[in-house]
Every structure is written in C-alpha cells, then in structure tokens.
Amino acid sequence: MGSRELNLRERQVLGIIIQLYVVTAAPVGSRYIARNYSLGLSDATIRNVMADLEAEGYISQPHTSAGRIPTDLGYRYYVDLIMKVQRIDEEEKRRMESDFGPISMEGRGTSAEVLVSAAKVLGSISRQLSVVLSPTLSNAVFEKLDMVLLSSTRMMVVLSIQSMFVKTIVMELQHELTRQKVDEVVDLLNERLSGLTLSEIRRSITRRLAGSSCDTNLKDLIVRSADSLFDESPIFERLYISGAEYIVEQPEFKQPERVRELITMIEDKFSVARLVEDIAPKQDLKRTAGHDVSISIGRENSALQAEDLTIVSAPYYAGSMVGTLGILGPKRMDYEHAVRVLNYMADCLTATLSDVN
C-alpha cells in the first residue's frame, strides 16, 4: 500500500481532502471538491481518483459518511511530498515577539522563565499542546558553583551553566563545616573546573582536585557526588508544558473518555518528554526553512496512548547545548502552520539563549 508516487490528480485531491478536513473536521466528498475547486475534473473523475487513493490506503471512509478522511499514510505523504511551508506572516510574528520578547530581551529572566514563556507562546499561537525540553547538559560548559549552607549538616549546591541554565542539588553533610571552609572549596572548584563541560568534569574531577589543602571531607563528598552533581537532570524536570486548554477544545476530544485519556497522558511528564525526545533522532526528518523538523503521525508514535496524535518537534540551541520544542495535537492538525510557528520559536529561543553566552 502506498508504494508508488502519486500522479498530479491524486496529489491535488489528497491535498484538498487534508486541507478541508483540517478546517472542518468533516469527511470530504467528491461532489464538494468538483463544485468548489477548479481542477478541471468532473465529479465522477474525482470519485475515481478518491477510490484509487482509498485502495492504496491514503484515505478511508467513516462508516456513517459518504465522504473520506485522511489516514496516517495520507498525512505522511502530505507532509513529506505535498506540503509547502511559507514564512511566518508579519502579524503572527509580531504577536509572538510581543508575548515572548519582554521575558527574553537583553537576557532578562532565568533560563526556566524563558522556556516557560516559550511554551506559553507556542501553545497560544498553535492552539495545541506545546512542549519545551531544556537542553541536555552533557556538552554544557560549567561557569561557576556556589554552596549555600541550609544547616550545619545540609547544604545546597548551585551550578551555573552557560546560557543562563542553573542546576541545584541538596547534599547531606557528615561533618559540620564553617563558612570559611565552604568558601575555600568553592574557590577551588571554580578555579579548576570553570570552562570545562560537565562530561569532562565527571571524567577528571578526582585528578583536577588533587593536591589541594581544602577541607578533605567536603572535597571528597563533591568527588563522590560528581556523577549526580555534574550530570543531566531527570527528563521530567526538563519539561515545560502549556496549551492543554486549547487541545481539549478540538472535536477529537468531545467525548469525556477521550479527555480523561489525554489529561492522564499530559500528567505523566516522563512519558510526554519521551514522546517528544524519541522522534528527534529519526531519519525521515522534514527539512524546512533551515530546521530539522520531525513529524511523527499516529501509530508512528512510540506510545499507545499517542496513536491518535501527531507530534511535531524541532531543535533549538544554547551554545553547544541542544534542546527540543514540540507541538502535540490531533492528527487533523494544520501541519504547515505547526511547522512554521515551531521554526520561528526555535529561532527566537536560539537567539535569546545565544545572546547571553
């Protein structure tokens, strides 16, 4: 099924069916296409074209309708070979910049605030569920560290990483420490580790801290904890979600059971993060407007609960680090619009997070 390249008529009819279905959520009939589109084809000819498309698995007929709707295969052919992505229009561009700009201009706000803002703007503009994954930290460059004594036996370690990113971890102390001893270790760590990537620090911290006269107990604790301290945060802690109020308005989620299933999935942050991250390395990327945009449709998704959804994702950059933006919605999605706004938000995030390096 779907092994050959479609001819011009078939491509035109498939494109029209998908574009109409995206807007109306109603099956599309041959008579409507013949009357409203100047294809130079009769109703009977269009009906025959639709029969061929159905036979090859690109469209299907709901039991209660004479019209046709796209299948996963039809959507896949559309996004790979028919869809044309235009530049974002000026009105939408101004709206995104006005909503995202205040938190991002001139490096104002923390990295978390910037990513929360990006998720909100992306959800509002796309009218779908938006997901922002903060960058993985393996190649992140360590800038400085500080230690805050919470009590005589507890302290919080704050790592400042390139592009405004911060990681914190609370550590239990086996021995009481003075502020002076803590400051000596902080100075040592910043002097010997600043400018290294987190992966380099994990591999070489023992050697790099050797020969110092700082507090041995605290220094040894830092070395023993290096794999957690200078490592990735759990994936669900890197996730920012917005737009649930928009996706539940879609006709696909009118039934209460469907809404419950969707909300359950959204609340499982680990699963949502994995869904978006899992499609990023795929080889069948849709290359558009300078971005590697990955589109995973229906049963292409790794999770059973996402078989009725489409996930569109794109990378953004913060120095040497790479994060992921995503839009989740029903398969009946405006794909061209989703790719367009995702591309532009990726540009905005990359510019914002690069400006502070």
Swiss-Prot record:
Assigned keywords, A-Z: Repressor, Stress response, Transcription, Transcription regulation
A Pfam family that the UniProt record links to this protein: HrcA
GO molecular-function terms, A-Z: DNA binding
NAD among keywords: no
Annotated GO biological process: negative regulation of DNA-templated transcription
Gene3D superfamilies, per database record: 3.30.450.40, Heat-inducible transcription repressor hrca homolog, domain 3 (3.30.390.60), Winged helix-like DNA-binding domain superfamily/Winged helix DNA-binding domain (1.10.10.10)
Keyword Transcription applies: yes
Source organism superkingdom: Bacteria
Annotated function: Negative regulator of class I heat shock genes (grpE-dnaK-dnaJ and groELS operons). Prevents heat-shock induction of these operons.
Membership in a protein family: Belongs to the HrcA family.
Name assigned to this protein: Heat-inducible transcription repressor HrcA
Organism: Chlorobium luteolum (strain DSM 273 / BCRC 81028 / 2530) (Pelodictyon luteolum)
